[in-house]
Amino acid sequence: MEASAWDLAVESVEEALRSRAGGSLARLGRLGQLGSLPSFIAALADDDDAAPHAFAHARERESLGFAPCEIAAELLAVGRVLDRGGERHARASVDRCVELYVERVTDELAENARRDPLTGVLNQLAFHTLAEKEVARARRYRSQLALVVFDLDNFKQTNDRNGHQEGDRLLRAFAAALRGTARESDAVGRIGGDEFAALLVQGDERAVRAFVRRLHTEVPDGVSTSAGAAYLGDGCATSEQLFALADRRLYGDKSARAA
């Protein structure tokens, strides 16, 4: 590259601003506009793996509030500038970096869509979808599968008395305890307001008892729960039947605690 990485970065930013695709750039000073673009362009010039530099620049832009479409547009502007300078090989590298960035953003969006935003565990839809798949898998391979549902005792009263902020703290704490208790092969999710569930692959009654014991050591003081478990083959052949039986046993446990 005949021009310096710095000069090419300036030209790329101007290109993005002219195209109106890099709208957020207009809010930054000149140094802020460039960010780590010079490092990215220098990596292209040296035939280094430019993707890590592109991702570092993208993370920097994301921290400043840039939308993914603005970041991709800025990287594409770099490609157009290089193309005009006859740097076809570098342009191809830029295009590949944009593809990888879009793939990363798409994967992150897909994963975020599966997560409960408050607690970070699987949301209701994702957990039920996974349960259906695991039931089908367990039936095909004739393996064991257990579903355990949990309900935080007296959560509504605590929420009303101490406020939603305290209620949210309890939900996050219990979700963290569930994640800390589950094995890598297990799955945990939030399936209602204060209801959670765990799916134990190859789980039987002994595994469930051990899981609940470990969970109790992880749960913060002052948090108590009711639980109900159901097992594939325990009169259950579908995920709907598993949830129905686990719910009945959950409320049986809750009633016994209240008696």
Predicted regions mapped to residue ranges:
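Alpha-helical transmembrane segments and their helix-membrane boundary motifs
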Residues: 61-78
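Conserved nucleotide-binding and Mg2+-coordinating catalytic segments in signaling enzymes
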Residues: 111-129, 150-163, 172
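Active-site-flanking beta-strand signature of metal-NTP-handling nucleotidyl enzymes
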Residues: 146-151, 188
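Core of compact, soluble alpha-helical bundle domains
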Residues: 1-59, 85-110
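Heptad-repeat coiled-coil signal-transmission/dimerization helices
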Residues: 127, 131-132, 148, 171, ...
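GGDEF/GGEEF active-site signature
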Residues: 172-234
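Short regulatory alpha-helical coupling segments
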Residues: 124-143, 158, 175-183
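Catalytic-core segments of nucleotide cyclases and related cyclic-nucleotide turnover enzymes
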Residues: 209-213, 232-259
